[in-house]
């Protein structure tokens, strides 16, 4: 009898284990759940900003690597591979940071595609008035604005790139070729023109300028239209080794007119003014004071203690203070900043002596490890 019962018991246990392992997690929600509630949609909308404030985005590699594009800013390098990397040389020893920007921007694109499709298929969207602003329509516009923002960075830095307007599905569908940049920019501009009237102004939103708003949508239309109508370096696909040539489409004037119209809307609708001094703008920025109706139209919503090295690399040089073990002290009054990114001395000297912006833009001091300030040995900051 014992030999009979043991296999039966084992079979029951295995069957139970299989049933147990196949259960659905109650903490996992599908689109049918998320996009039937405005509060859940808000969570998905917040997720669209994650790549922006990660080390791959505007507080990290995107700012640190892609802003070095003029004769104003520079940083020191010690090896030839660093120089090659800054020139996008394929033989560079480490170009992972550029790859992270690429993946970060497409992560943002896919998140926005998820939200756009989810809202469009939602019963809330079907019942919504699509002719005037509402919370749902604002979320919808916000998703399209952020998608355009991610694509603009891809086009600005890489030109013709893979283009998707739907969420990533079957992995076989991910391997697509590049789309002409003008097609991408045209689509994005048309998307924004469509949603601009149904978005809230920053002063009407509980997130102010730290989220996409109607006036930011207007400004982004103008900016993208200038790119769409401007000159860009086009590749010679018949000869990949060639440098290419500068070109622009015959309809360029149409997009300059769009840029003028929507930049004019930002100005004429009067939602923002320039009441603060140049100094006060930066004092408030460093004090986490974010007015909804002044100089800033959109602030990347980075948080205190979040990831990213923008302030660390581009900020004032703060000498590290060490603890008894030789490590950076956690209780240093000003923290620590490498100040590795600098402005050229010639740029500082281009300011008029009476221009009050000079000494705020080009800092001539650093914080010593005592917490006191001192004149920097090299007059570049």
Indicate residue ranges for each PLM-predicted region:
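Secondary-structure transition into beta-strands, especially the periplasmic turns and strand N-termini
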Residues: 4-8, 14, 127-137, 152, ...
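Conserved, well-structured interaction surfaces
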Residues: 30, 42-56, 78-158, 172-186, ...
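Short edge-strand/loop segments of extracellular domains
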Residues: 167-171
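Proline-rich low-complexity regions
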Residues: 25-26, 162-165, 199, 203
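Residue-level detector of conserved, well-ordered beta-strand and adjacent loop positions
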Residues: 89, 164, 299
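Bacterial Sec-dependent N-terminal signal peptides
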Residues: 1-26
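An aromatic- and glycine-enriched ligand-binding surface/loop that stacks and positions planar moieties
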Residues: 18-82, 159-161, 193, 211-380
């Amino acid at each position: 009898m014992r030999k009979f019962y043991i296999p039966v018991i084992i079979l029951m246990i295995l069957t139970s284990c299989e049933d147990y392992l196949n259960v659905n997690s109650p903490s996992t929600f599908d689109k049918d759940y998320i996009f039937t509630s405005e509060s859940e949609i808000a969570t998905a909308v917040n997720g669209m900003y994650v790549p922006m404030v990660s080390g791959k985005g505007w507080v990290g590699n995107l700012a640190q690597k892609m802003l070095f594009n003029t004769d104003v800013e520079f940083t020191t390098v010690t090896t030839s591979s660093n120089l090659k990397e800054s020139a996008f040389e394929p033989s560079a020893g480490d170009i992972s940071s550029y790859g992270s920007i690429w993946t970060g921007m497409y992560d943002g694109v896919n998140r926005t595609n998820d939200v756009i499709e989810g809202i469009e298929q939602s019963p809330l969207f079907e019942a919504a008035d699509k002719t005037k602003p509402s919370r749902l329509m604002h979320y919808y516009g916000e998703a399209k604005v952020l998608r355009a923002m991610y694509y603009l960075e891809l086009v600005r830095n890489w030109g013709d790139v893979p283009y998707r307007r739907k969420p990533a599905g079957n992995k076989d569908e991910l391997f697509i070729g590049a789309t002409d940049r003008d097609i991408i920019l045209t689509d994005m501009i048309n998307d924004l023109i469509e949603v601009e009237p149904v978005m809230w102004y920053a002063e009407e939103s509980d997130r102010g300028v730290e989220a996409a708003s109607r006036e930011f949508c207007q400004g982004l239309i103008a900016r993208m239209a200038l790119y769409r109508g401007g000159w860009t370096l086009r590749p010679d696909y018949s000869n990949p080794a060639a440098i290419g040539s500068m070109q622009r489409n015959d309809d360029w004037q149409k997009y300059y007119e769009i840029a003028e119209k929507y930049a004019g809307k930002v100005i004429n609708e009067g939602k923002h003014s320039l009441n603060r001094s140049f100094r006060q703008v930066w004092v408030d920025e460093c004090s986490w004071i974010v007015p909804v109706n002044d100089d800033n139209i959109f602030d990347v919503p980075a948080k205190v203690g979040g990831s990213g090295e923008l302030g660390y690399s581009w900020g004032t040089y703060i000498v590290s203070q060490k603890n008894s073990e030789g490590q950076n002290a956690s209780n240093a009054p000003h923290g620590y900043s490498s100040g590795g990114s600098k402005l050229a001395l010639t740029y500082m000297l281009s300011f008029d002596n009476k221009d009050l912006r000079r000494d705020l833009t080009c800092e001539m001091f650093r914080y010593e490890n005592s917490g006191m300030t001192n004149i920097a040995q090299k007059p570049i900051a």
